Amino acid sequence: NTGDIVVALVDEQEAVLDRARGVGVQAFLNISTKQAEWAQVVGTAQKTADVYASVGIHPHHADEHSELERADLLAAAKGGKVIGIGETGLDYYYDHSDREAQKHLFRLHIDVARELQLPVIIHTRDAEDDTLAILKDEMGKGAFPALIHCFTASADFGQQVLDLGLSISISGIVTFKNARDLQEFAKAIPQDRLLVETDSPFLAPVPHRGKTCEPGFVHDTATFLADLRGESLDSLAEYTTRNFYALFSKAVP
C-alpha cells in the first residue's frame, strides 16, 4: 500500500535523511501531489535546513481538484522553502483523471510558475504529444523553467523538450535491465541539463529493487549513470548538483 510506505518513511524521517546524508546527499526536495499535502510538505521543509518543498497537483488527482483556484496555488508557492511547482503534468497510462482536467491543471501550474519563475516539475506518461503541445503553446506566452521528472519517454520527445530548454531528471529506472532505450538516451543528455532523482518511495534502483526507495539510493543511480556515460561519479555528482541549484534557484547551497 503506497500510503503505508509513505507513512513509514515519514515516521522514520530523520533516520532516512541521515542515511542519505551519510552517502553525500546535500539537499532534499519533497514533492507534493495534492493540496492536502501542502501544509505538511512545506512545514517539514521549514523545520529542516536541508529539505525543500514543492506544491502541486499530480495528474492522478486532477479530478478531485477541479475547483482549485489559481490564487491558492500562487499563495502556497510563495511560501518559505517552496522552490518548485508540481508535480503536475499528464498521465494517459492510468487515466485516473479526466484528460481535460489534467490539461487545465497543467496549464494553471505553468501559469503560476511563469509568474514566480519557479521550475515546473512535470510528470508525463503516454501523453507525449499533448505534453509537447502544451509546453510549446505555453512557452509562446513567456518562458518558464521546467523539468521532466523521472524521465521514461521516447528519445524523440526527450530531444524536443531539450530543444525547448527543459532539463531532464533520471530515476532508478535507468538501472533496470529492460531500460535499454532509456539508457541510450541518458548517455546523450547534455551535462548542463541532467539531474538525478529517486522518486522515493517508488522505483528503487538496482541493487535495492523490491525495497522501499529512499533518498540515499540516489547514490546508486548516480554511480550507474556515471559509468553508463563514461564519467567519474565525482564529476557527475558535481555537475548534477550544480544543475539542481541553477534550476531550483530559490534553494541555497
Segments predicted by a language model, with ranges:
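Mid-domain alpha/beta scaffold segments of enzyme catalytic cores
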Residues: 1-253
